Amino acid sequence: MKVYVSNYLSRSISILDYSTLEFERDIKLDENIYPHNFCIDNRQQLAYIPSSLDGELYVLDLSIGKIIDNISIGGKLTNIALCNDELFISNEDSNSIYILDVKTSNPIGVIGVDNMPHGFDIDSINNRLYVACINSIICIDTISKSICKKIDTDFKSWHIKLDRNKKEIYTSTLDGKV
């Protein structure tokens, strides 16, 4: 098992051994790729890296350490998750979640959400995607591709994490609160 670390400013991804936390290697990315969030497809040994700079989704082959594909989506892409062979990608510019078929790289759809979706967390057991937006948290059913719940908030949600054991949602805000 591995730990993958995004190094935004050095434009690289570090790989550590999970059990020892020993450094194994760095994968240097192209000059215009700044990894912030990414997801791993362990079966295919691929990393999907959304770009907030150029609206591209980069596909990194972890076995050879090279970008093997890029998919033009557009906008300011900020977060990504893999669920049921589909990629869910947040786009702050269009206030939407873009859905892509991982096997074909074809678009499946776009779900409009509230203002500035940035972070999200996926509950793959219940097929739910929880999206942090400014002044709300949106819950999306990943099977029907529809919003099943909206929670209005009086804070600017930025990142979000589910605690499935406690059945709680944690979110950090733009002004540094949890």
Task: Name the predicted role of every residue range.
Residues 1-178:
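Predominantly soluble domains enriched in secretory-pathway, periplasmic, or organellar proteins
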